[in-house]
Amino acid sequence: AALLAVAMVCAMAIPAWAAPATNGSITVKNTVDGKTYKIYKILDLETNGTGDDASSYTAFKYKATTKWKSFVDSSTYLEPDADGYVTWKAATENAADIEAFSKAAMKFAANLASDATQVADNSGSVTFTGLELGYYLITSDVDTSSKALCMLSTTKPSATVQEKNGAPTVEKKVEYASGSWGEGNDGNVGDTVNF
């Protein structure tokens, strides 16, 4: 009875709290039916901030995965510290360098097995679930230059990426003398032609 009482007192002293997310998901929207989508985990989430800094991207600490360690160690854009925690090099935190980093990562990924692969159906999206938290590269075979980077953390364990695939279509029309629009028109030198 005394042991039960001690256990009850200890249990009452433990505050209720929600455990942080340990798994995440990545959804790719605007997918093309029959095309292959792959994800590669570049960095593992090792620790994260607490309190007021928990929602800041600087609160999270990442280390290179085993497959990506050589890429990260030789990267122009990332810098591992003595403990292996990775940060962006200060001079490379701009859109152009992040784009260049993702291109270099995509080239490196060509020689690796992906962490997950899905073939899109006609639903217009694919979702990768049960992912360990970290920093991911997403590629597709819609366009060989198609890639995206996303971070899954304890405060944002899910990410949605909108794929930009294909070139925009342009419909060309020319105005007829009658004011209607069509595919062609006759004109003389000096005539005004609206198109």
Could you say what each language-model-derived stretch is?
Residues 1-195:
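Solvent-exposed loop/turn and edge beta-strand elements of beta-rich ligand-binding domains
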